[in-house]
From Swiss-Prot:
GO biological process, one term: mRNA 3'-end processing
Gene: MSP1
Residue span, EGF-like domain: 1661-1703, 1704-1752
Disulfide cysteine pairs (residue numbers): 1663-1675, 1687-1699, 1707-1720, 1714-1734, 1736-1750
Keywords, in A-Z order: Cell membrane, Disulfide bond, EGF-like domain, Glycoprotein, GPI-anchor, Lipoprotein, Malaria, Membrane, Merozoite, Repeat, Secreted, Signal
Top-level taxon: Eukaryota
Lipidated residues (GPI-anchor amidated serine): 1751
Protein name: Merozoite surface protein 1
Localization per record: Cell membrane; Secreted
């Protein structure tokens, strides 16, 4: 199907989030104001006489020799324009600036006028284009357009005609190849003519004679000579501008023609035209008719052409470049994918054309051209390439987009026209928050601005704020005083400023209307070329007055002062509120901090006990089972304690966030401006509203088509079109990916069966055969995890369902949900005027869809989520909302507790009296006797008040009482909350105050009631000391419904929630369940009665507190519960948005980093390829050294090949990494710390795999480096031996090849120990030279005598230019391209030795060229070998270091991924393990996995140890061999110094610089080798330590597994091991580390037994004093304290205190082992052995250890609470 592949890409053509920041708007306004000023000033300065129709000609022109002001005015004017940055006019501006200082130049400019007119044309053009841009930007009153910058419709239309009409001729012929070619040829002629004109004008420009004219010597003759030069300078600029435009046109049109001719459908048609043009023309009588063709038909091409034409017309609008396949039926019956013609031989064959008459020929050609034109219409032509000016190009794109909207079937234009435009100030009564620029957002995220700054808080004196403002109370008080002082000072000025402002505003408004009229008249007359001097002067006057008044109004301080006072008041209110709630927050932080310390202390004690037992068990051969049980219980408790610690850490983080001093942008009752993210959401809603009808229309047409044409099958539609719509897929690849991710993450419970299929595969399968862009889209692991689990098991066949209609319907469902969701988010959070917002009200169907899929802010499109400014707006809105919630929650909590305590606590009553809330009590009068009836009435009234605080037991006994018919609104709200709990809570509700506001809030927010209900449930069931929470639980029948009924309803769906909180102990209780009511109560009870701040707070709430009644208190409690839930909701959003922003920031950083890696690797690859080419060059080498250089060259070739392969691998890896980050999307709905950790692990594994592929070649390169060092070392040895021969005989010229072979062999043998294993040195032979010479070209002229006539490579990686291994100083490398930049040492290639320092000339003594020919050639060879040695030595060090580092990094990444399973045991705040050895807490499967992976890591360490050891051995051997050679060099120097013959000594001393240099080389290499060997030794020690740690950990894990296996055996035989469990419980109770109830719960869960079974030995019957209890025995403590141990059944007492197995137990002996009071019975067991059954009788009916002991007391003597706890634990 042609459309399906493009469907999901086309969907999001309009769904893109565009950020227009306030900076963009301000910059545009500033630029336009400058352009407006230049336009008016320029008309006055340059064009007055040209534009104004009745302008009087000046009596005399401006004379630059007498008028010195004009030149300065021009300079200032041009400088202002240059500052605007319009680069296309740079040459013209520079010309005017160059001519203005010269009086001749000024005179020319005045006379010519062309330069000024050109500049003014550009200014007016930019002014109009940018005014039009501002007009579009501020459409629908999105922003305000200043009066003097508005543009009329006439001007807009004219601008469109000028820019679009100028390119219209090209658009008219863009599909006609014939006309395009003619047009191209004509423009090429124009290009040639312009080039000739430019060359001609350039010749006229003479550099001489450009001096200025400043005296009387200036005359007209000199000016007449200069004028043609000035004119030529302008002409060159003018012609170049035209040339650039025409060349762009030619380039674009040639590309267009080439694209059309290469098209698979057009190509055969074009071939037919060429054949027809070349065919002869005859008369009609002689024409030949082809076989099988009617004589009346013009030809096969003609008939097929007509069919093709209609086919092309039918499919013209289906895609951007789909027409590549259309019309190919002319010669091919079918077309393959991507527009490639079928391989049928008939398709590639152009049939022979019959000879036609001229008329027939022309008609046939015209028909073919018509077909081509129809096909070309469907192939996209990008006209944007012809534009030179970017401002003009931007306008063209904008207008073309508008045209496409107007031409489409959508109602975008109609909707805009019919929409009632509401002014911006009315639409957004509180204004708009514009987004921050992206770079500012990145900086804020990098610096964690929300947590490291004080928000919108500044010191009134503009001094820096202290860093301890949150903790330093005095600093806050000082700041509050300073703010109050500043407010008073500013308010004093405000009245005067207000009067001044009103006066200036009145004056400005008075000038506004006259200016508008004058401006309208001016621009209209100028537009119609009817501008008169009167109109212009009037406009100038009114404009000057208007701009003056506008400037005065803008500079008025009233507005700024008022804003400053509002800001200061906001800061003051916040600081005062913060100071009030600071004590409560501090207490909360202290509570959770203490709880954390307590947990950490318990964890440390448990961890030490666990480790001690673990060590004992590891070291012991015989492990007591009771100790195993104790260990397992402690480990289980340790895990739970760590979980509890992390929960407490989360609660502590929440409390610390409350403690964060952060002044929001809006606070309290201040009007909140519309957040930018809601503006983005509104745009998406508007776009979806336009797009959904189009999809519905497509669905209707598709259904109609399927009904009309049932014969059309999916197979016919599977024939894909030509090259797919690359433009649409490129625009929306990420959006389509995001659509699938978003849609797949929203379950549709009520959809049809087809709707349950995953959304993601649909676009992927559809787009894969047609677009490259979609193939490159990578779906990350985090996105894959959002797919429904049932996707893989779907039974619906894929092919029958994958139809165009199926796709359209799925798309429509997703868009409808997205539309409903975005509308809901907008409705819940927007501050838009109600009338404007009513347009977006949800229909009943939309609300149903939204409710079923539980829409929230997390469902916004990825285009919004992945936009940094928009996402930061979401985050900032949540941060501000949290601060408001914290304050409101404090106020309501305080009022609630004040009301509750006012009658109980005298100090509270005293505070209320001081604040004037209640009247002081009158003096007590004698109490009269109360009649019985009155007392009875009081008793009846008392429950109405006291029922607000019932006992927890009362609550549990009356769960259904509040659910009555008197509370329908609450019940309804509760039912609604079940569908969307807390997802769409409006942020504005957090600011509601008062009971009336809360009622409205709860009515609008279903989640509020459910949230408060759960809070009340927790309050009433978790603690006996929470009267405030329980107070509203059971109200009187006359009160509104409290929080309890929703809690009851919510518990019915999840019975765990209420019961578990009762059953758990305080240690096991989640930290979040701790009720903070006691903090408020304690604070109020301890507050100082003279606390003026708190008294002022009570005064501010005086009326609200007075109005409180029991009913309103219940309502207040509901509001508090709702705010608590809302704060949790906001905190979750805060954490998620923060993670998202950090994710986007890290993604941005990773993309930049990876791009740098790709750039560096690309440079490295280019240099390696260049080096590879160099290695194949031609070199001339001194005879006798061919083998050294040849072997080194061969090793170098392999080295470069390996490096290239590794570089290609790394490039592939980093490109895939970049692709992953750019295409991957992390939806908010699935974003979490865990998902980011999984992503991080995925990336580490990918890096691990990439590095693993490099290892083998890195190892090979190290070995190749050893080879090269060995060969170069041999060459140096041979050089030294040759110099020794020269010292003996200065006439020595070297040995011939046969005689030289043994010496070469000896040189190789000297350093063969440096070769890697498996590499041997082949003995050089005479044939070596012969072979080289055979393949070599003839020795070129000028070759040095004695050189080997062969091409012997000698270049190395990093060879320095000039370092030529030749046979003489004049010998050069032939055909080499040596890389002269060797500083890039990325991964494989090491940098060479720095050659910046000047090199000492060691051959300076040998001045006679003819006498020392061989010496100088040998010296050059030595220089080359020396450079090779230094470079090879540096390279092998770098390769070895990089190889070891890569493996270490790979191993570390592997271990980090491995340790991910231990994250549960990390402290959230420090990211460190809570205990030292977290491995012991893993289960067996994970331990096995850890062992396998640790063994793999150990294997890697062994390889590193082997590599390092081999490296140490190599460098030590290198030092040893070089020391021997160094000693020989020193000896030779000493021999020369000791020479007695003066003549010989002077001759030999010439060689001392060479020998000293060789000595220095050896000393340098030896020193560096020893240093690196020591470094490798340190690495080796570290590797051994690391290996030892891994081995110890592996052994410990194996021991842990053995212990766990024994424990598993114990669990399997739990029924027989109850006594062991009892012993373990007893020991644990004695230790004090584990509570009695806690240990039994853990043991019950571990043994999978009923908790009561573990009470076989009650704690009071557990032995305390008896220590030496043998194995297979049980100990019992009587009620009187007597302790006794007895052997268990099946065992008997042996020698000493032991119990041995009893193979034949009988009741006759020792009562069979039963208690003496018990009855004993013999029974046959399944193993044909006897078994004893003991039965305890009254008065001791309770059996212990299967009747070995009998007692009168049983488990029923235990605490009833413990029994209930165990029962509940086993049930749930």
């Amino acid at each position: 199907m042609k459309v399906i592949g493009l469907l999901f890409s086309f969907v999001f053509f309009a769904i893109k989030c565009k950020s227009e920041t306030i900076e963009v708007y301000n910059d545009l306004i500033q630029k336009l104001e400058k352009l407006e000023s230049l336009s008016v000033d320029g008309l006055e300065l340059f064009q007055k006489s040209q534009v104004i129709i009745n302008a009087t000609q000046p009596t005399e022109t401006i004379d630059p020799f007498t008028n010195h002001n004009f030149a300065q005015q021009v300079q200032d004017f041009v400088t202002k324009f240059e500052g605007l940055g319009f680069t296309e006019q740079t040459e013209l501006v520079n010309l005017i600036k160059a001519l203005t200082p010269n009086r001749y130049g000024v005179k020319y400019l005045i006379e010519s006028k062309e330069e000024f007119n050109g500049l003014m044309h550009a200014i007016n053009f930019y002014y109009d284009v940018l005014r039009d841009k501002l007009n579009d930007m501020c459409a629908n009153n999105y922003c305000e357009i200043p009066e003097h910058l508005k543009i009329s419709e006439e001007e807009t239309e004219m601008l469109k005609k000028v820019i679009l009409g100028y390119r219209k001729p090209i658009e008219n012929i863009q599909d006609d190849i014939e006309k395009l070619e003619i047009y191209i040829e004509r423009n090429k002629e124009t290009v040639a003519a312009l080039n000739a004109l430019i060359a001609e004008e350039t010749k006229k420009i003479q550099p001489e004679g450009n001096e200025d004219c400043n005296d009387a010597s200036c005359d007209s003759d000199k000016y007449n000579k200069k004028k043609p030069i000035y004119q030529a300078m302008y002409n060159v600029i003018f012609y170049k501008k035209q040339l650039a435009e025409i060349q762009k046109v030619v380039e674009v049109l040639e590309k267009r023609v080439s694209t059309l001719k290469k098209n698979d459908a057009i190509k055969p048609l074009w071939q037919q035209i060429e054949v027809l043009n070349a065919a002869p023309v005859v008369t009609a009588e002689t024409q030949i008719v082809t076989g099988g063709q009617s004589s009346t038909e013009p030809g096969s091409g003609g008939s097929s052409a007509s069919g093709t034409s209609s086919s092309g017309q039918a499919s013209a609008g289906t895609g951007v470049e789909q027409a590549n396949t259309v019309a190919s039926v002319t010669v091919t019956p079918s077309v393959g994918q991507n527009g490639e013609a079928s391989t049928n031989p008939q398709t590639a064959q152009v049939q022979p054309v019959p000879t036609l008459t001229l008329e027939e020929k022309q008609k046939k050609i015209a028909g073919l051209y018509a077909q081509i034109k129809e096909i070309a219409k469907t192939i996209k032509f990008n006209l944007e390439g012809i534009f030179v000016d970017p401002i003009e190009l931007e306008y063209f794109k904008k207008e073309k987009k508008k045209e496409s909207c107007n031409l489409s079937t959508s109602s975008c234009k109609k909707n805009k026209a019919s929409e009632t435009i509401i002014p911006l100030t009315i639409r957004y009564p509180n204004g708009i928050s514009y987004p921050l620029p992206e770079n500012d957002v990145y900086n804020k995220i990098a610096n964690n601005a929300a947590e490291t700054t004080y928000g919108d808080l500044t010191h009134p004196d503009n001094t820096p704020l202290t860093g301890d403002l949150a903790t330093n109370e005095q600093a806050r008080k000082d700041l509050i005083k300073a703010i109050k002082k500043k407010i008073k000072a500013e308010e004093k000025k405000l009245e005067t400023l207000k009067t001044n402002y009103d006066n200036k505003l009145t004056e400005f408004n008075q000038q506004k209307t006259p200016f508008k009229e004058a401006a309208k008249e001016f621009y209209e007359s100028k537009f119609r070329n009817k501008l008169t001097s009167e109109i212009f002067e009037k406009f100038k006057t009114k404009r000057d007055e208007y701009m003056t008044k506008k400037t005065e109004l803008n500079t008025c301080e009233y507005g700024n002062t008022k804003e400053l006072i509002n800001k200061l008041n906001k800061q003051l209110n916040y600081l005062q509120d913060y100071s009030l709630r600071k004590d409560i927050i501090s207490n909360e932080i202290e509570y959770f901090s203490n709880k954390k310390k307590e947990l950490q202390y318990n964890i440390n004690r448990l961890a030490e006990a666990v480790q001690a037992k673990q060590n004992v068990l590891v070291a012991s051969k015989d492990v007591p089972l009771s100790t195993l049980v104790e260990l397992q219980i402690q480990k289980s408790l340790l895990t739970k304690q760590i979980e509890q610690l992390n929960k407490t850490e989360v609660s502590l983080n929440k409390a610390q966030l409350k403690d964060k001093l952060y002044v929001p942008k809006t606070y309290g009752n201040e009007g909140k401006p519309e957040p930018y993210y809601l503006i983005a959401v509104k745009k998406e809603v508007d776009r979806l509203a336009q797009f959904i009808p189009k999809i519905e229309s497509m669905i209707a047409k598709e259904k109609e088509r399927m009904e009309q044409g049932p014969a059309i099958t999916g197979e016919s539609e599977e024939v894909p079109s030509g090259p797919s719509a690359e433009s649409s897929t490129d625009r929306s690849t990420q959006s389509s990916t995001s659509s699938s991710s978003s849609s797949s993450s929203t379950p549709a419970a009520a959809e049809s069966s087809s709707a349950t299929l995953p959304e993601a595969p649909a676009p992927a399968e559809a787009a894969s055969p047609s677009t490259e862009a979609s193939e490159e889209t990578t779906i990350p692991p985090t996105t894959q995890e959002t797919q429904p689990s049932q996707a893989a098991s779907s039974t619906t066949p894929a092919k029958p369902v994958m139809t165009k209609l199926y796709y359209l319907e799925k798309l429509q469902k997703f868009l409808v949900f997205s539309y409903s969701c975005h509308k809901y988010v907008l409705l819940q959070n927007s501050t838009i005027n109600k009338d404007a917002l009513s347009k977006y009200a949800l229909t009943s169907e939309e609300d149903k869809i939204r409710t079923l899929k539980r829409c929230s802010e997390l469902d916004v499109l990825l285009a919004i989520q992945n936009n940094m400014p928009t996402m930061y707006s979401l985050y900032e809105s949540i941060v501000d909302g949290l601060q408001n919630i914290y304050t409101e929650l404090y106020e309501k909590e305080m009022m609630y507790h004040i009301y509750k305590l006012k009658d109980e606590n005298p100090s509270i009553k005293s505070l209320l009296v001081k604040a004037g809330v209640i009247e002081p009590e009158p003096v007590a009068a004698p109490t009269p006797v109360t009649p019985a009836a009155t007392e009875q009435q009081q008793q009846q009234a008392t429950p109405d008040v006291q029922s607000d605080a019932p006992a927890p037991s009362d609550v549990s006994q009356q769960p259904e009482t509040p659910v009555t018919s008197t509370t329908p609104e609450v019940t309804t709200s509760t039912e609604a909350s079940s569908s969307a709990p807390g997802e769409g809570t409006p942020s504005g509700e957090a600011g509601a105050s008062g009971t009336e506001g809360a009622t409205a809030s709860n009515a609008a927010t279903p989640a509020g009631t459910s949230a408060s209900g759960s809070a009340a449930s927790n309050a009433s069931t978790t603690s006996d000391v929470t009267p405030p929470a329980a107070a509203a639980a059971v109200p009187s029948t006359s009160t509104p419904a409290p929080a309890q009924p929703p809690a009851a309803n919510s518990q019915s769906g999840n019975p765990d929630s209420g019961i578990r909180s009762r059953a758990e102990s305080e240690e096991d209780m989640p930290a979040d369940d701790f009720e903070l009511d006691n903090l408020y109560k304690s604070y109020l009870q301890q507050i100082d009665g003279n606390n003026t701040e708190f008294i002022n707070f009570i005064k501010s709430k005086k009326e609200l507190i007075k109005a409180l009644t029991p009913e309103k208190v219940n309502q207040l409690y509901l509001e508090i519960a709702h705010l608590k839930e809302l704060s949790e909701h906001y905190y979750d959003r805060y954490s998620t948005y923060k993670l998202k922003l950090e994710r986007l920031y890290n993604k941005h950083e990773q993309i930049q980093l990876t791009n740098r890696q790709i750039r560096d690797l690309s440079i490295l690859k280019a240099r390696l390829l260049k080096r590879k080419q160099t290695l194949n060059g031609v070199f001339y080498i001194l005879n006798g050294y061919v083998n050294f250089f040849n072997k080194r060259r061969e090793a170098e070739k392999q080295y470069v090949d390996n490096a290239l392969k590794n570089t290609d691998m790394l490039l592939k890896y980093y490109k895939a990494r970049t692709k992953y980050f750019t295409s991957e999307a992390v939806p908010l709905k699935t974003l979490s710390k865990a998902s980011l950790d999984r992503e991080s692990n995925y990336l580490k594994i990918e890096k691990f795999r990439a590095y693993s592929r490099l290892e083998l070649r890195l190892k090979k390169n190290i070995n190749l480096g050893k080879e090269r060092i060995s060969y170069v070392s041999g060459g140096l040895h041979h050089v030294f031996e040759e110099f020794k021969e020269l010292i003996k005989d200065k006439d020595y010229t070297g040995k011939k090849n046969p005689d030289n072979a043994p010496e070469v062999t000896n040189a190789f043998e000297q350093y063969k120990e440096l070769l890697p294993k498996g590499v041997t040195v082949s003995t050089p032979a005479v044939a070596v030279t012969t072979t080289l010479a055979a393949d070599a070209p003839a020795t070129p002229e000028g070759a040095v005598p004695g050189a080997v006539p062969g091409a012997v490579p000698g270049a190395v990686p990093g060879a320095v230019p000039g370092a030529v291994p030749g046979s003489g100083t004049d010998t050069r490398v032939a055909g080499s391209s040596v890389d002269d930049n060797e500083d890039d040492d990325i991964y494989q290639i090491a940098s060479g030795q720095s050659e910046d320092a000047p090199e000492k000339d060691i051959l300076s003594e040998f001045t006679n060229e003819s006498l020392y020919v061989y010496t100088k050639r040998l010296g050059s060879t030595y220089k080359s070998l020396k450079k090779h040695m230094l470079r090879e030595f540096s390279t092998i060090k770098e390769d070895m270091t990089n190889g070891l580092n890569n493996k270490s990094q790979k191993r570390n990444d592997f271990l980090e991924v491995l340790s991910h399973e231990l994250d549960l045991f990390k402290d959230l705040s420090t990211n460190k393990y809570v205990i030292r050895n977290p491995y012991q807490l893993l289960d067996n499967d994970k331990k096995d996995k850890q062992i396998v992976n640790l063994k793999y890591a150990t294997k890697g360490i062994n390889e590193d140890i082997e590599t390092t050891t081999d490296g140490i051995k190599f460098f030590n051997k290198m030092v040893e061999l070089y020391n021997t050679q160094l000693a020989a060099v020193k000896e030779q120097i000493a021999t020369i110094e000791a020479e007695t013959n003066d003549t010989n000594k002077e001759e030999k001393k010439k060689y001392i610089p060479i020998l000293e240099d060789l000595k220095g080389l050896y000393e340098t290499v030896i020193g560096q080798a020893e240093e690196y060997s020591e470094e490798l030794q340190n690495r080796l020690d570290n590797y051994k330590n690391e290996k030892a740690e891994f081995e110890i950990l592996t052994k410990n894990l194996e021991k842990y597994i053995q212990i766990d296996e024994k424990l598993d055996e114990f669990v399997e035989h739990a029924e027989n091991n109850k006594h062991i469990a009892s012993i373990a419980l007893n020991n644990l109770n004695k230790s004090g580390l584990v509570g009695e109830g806690e240990s039994k719960k853990i043991l019950a869960k571990m043994l999978n037994m009923d908790g009561m079974d573990l009470l076989g030995v009650d704690p009071k019957h557990v032995c305390v004093d008896t220590r030496d209890i043998p194995k297979n025995a049980g100990c019992f403590r009587d009620d009187n304290g007597t302790e006794e141990w007895r052997c268990l059944l099946g065992y008997k007492k042996g020698e000493g205190n032991t119990c041995v197995e009893n193979n034949n137990p009988t009741c006759d002996i020792n009562n069979g082992g039963c208690d003496p009071t018990a009855s004993c019975q013999n029974a046959e067991s399944t193993e044909n052995s006897k078994k004893i059954i003991c039965t305890c009788k009254e008065p001791t009916p309770n059996a212990y250890y299967e009747g070995v002991f009998c007692s009168s007391s049983s488990f029923m003597g235990l605490s009833i609470l413990l029994i209930i706890t165990l029962i509940v634990f086993n049930i749930f």
